[in-house]
From Swiss-Prot:
It comes from Arabidopsis thaliana. The chain crosses the membrane at residues 31-47, 54-71. Homopentamer. The gene is PCR1. Expressed in aerial part, but not in roots. Detected in the guard and mesophyll cells. It is found in: Cell membrane. The lineage of its organism: Eukaryota, Viridiplantae, Streptophyta, Embryophyta, Tracheophyta. The keyword Disulfide bond does not apply. GO terms for molecular function: mRNA binding. It is a multi-pass membrane protein. This is Protein PLANT CADMIUM RESISTANCE 1. It comes from the Eukaryota.
Length: 151
């Protein structure tokens, strides 16, 4: 199944999978259905390039959702961030509409997009950066990890 996912080319500026393709990755779909904070945390860690851990991002999502029911709004912010990083067409209104109509579909679409771009979502940012470095930096479609400030 994973080989098929990576083999599908997608148009520049477009999502690699459709909004309603949740069941193309049944495992992630079930995880997201039962506990969306896990999928959100995995996505946020990659999008934030490791500045926030999966656990911290997932816990914050869950806390925001439990206290204010605005977890979807928080996830919306990450859709925009991800679109900007990968030059995917869209706008904030569409992101919000997707998350408010079907948060499950929106989160799984983000997860699949990162997976299609070469990320192993179970490794997190640091694991993927190390994997890329060990493979000579050519296997992943992710931006290279930037170190601290230099002169």
């Amino acid at each position: 199944m994973e080989a098929q996912l990576h083999a599908k080319p997608h148009a520049q500026g477009e999502w690699s999978t459709g909004f309603c393709d949740c069941f193309s990755d049944c495992r992630n779909c079930c995880i997201t259905l039962c506990c969306p904070c896990i999928t959100f945390g995995q996505v946020a860690e990659i999008v934030d390039r490791g500045s926030k851990s999966c656990c911290a991002a997932g816990a914050l999502y869950m806390l925001i959702d439990l206290i204010t029911s605005c977890g979807r709004m928080y996830a919306c912010f990450y859709s925009g961030k991800m679109r900007a990083q990968y030059n995917i067409k869209g706008d904030g209104c569409t992101d919000c509409l997707k998350h408010f109509c079907c948060n499950l579909c929106a989160l799984t679409q983000q997860y699949r997009e990162l997976k299609h771009r070469g990320f192993d979502m179970s490794l997190g940012w640091a694991g993927n950066a190390e994997k890329q470095q060990n493979q000579g930096g050519v296997a992943m479609g992710a931006p290279a990890f930037q170190g601290g400030m230099t002169r």
